Amino acid sequence: MFKIGEFIYPWGSGHYSRMMRLNDALLDQIKGEIDVHFSSKDHVIEKLLKKFPDKKEKIHEILMPTPIDGKFGPSVSKSLMNILLPIANNPSLIRQIVNYLREERKLYNKEKFDLVINDGDMGSNILA
């Protein structure tokens, strides 16, 4: 069995849409049995659970760091302050990144993916 880890950045919906199209193409192209796991947070997790209700054990919530929303997109000032300070129920960005990389590493070690695909997720690149 071929095991794939798909890591989807949760800010906006473009990352999710691209990964779902890619996932459909992979299922069409790869012959044989594949085991796909998804990782993200917030609204993307909700979409994944709705789309794959029978695969809850393969949907992993990892709290990926994202910008703090402002009125018309990301709030640059709040996101910059969040580097060191907790802002709007978000722990400091440094703490978020450390926790995020730790959780992602645990998932990699546990699942032993044959292939990792990410869209907007920086952790896979750092851990590589």
Each language-model region and where it sits:
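A short, Lys/Arg-enriched amphipathic alpha-helix followed by its capping loop at the start of a domain
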Residues: 21-34
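Extreme N-terminal starter segment of soluble prokaryotic enzymes
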Residues: 1-5
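Conserved nucleotide-sugar phosphate-binding/catalytic loop shared by glycosyltransferases and other
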Residues: 10, 33-93
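Short catalytic-loop micro-motif centered on adjacent basic/acidic residues
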Residues: 6, 35-38, 115-117
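A short, glycine/small-residue-rich beta-strand->loop->alpha-helix junction that serves as a flexible
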Residues: 8-20
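Conserved nucleotide-sugar donor-binding subdomain of glycosyltransferases
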Residues: 77-118
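An aromatic- and histidine-rich active-site surface loop
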Residues: 44-47, 116-128
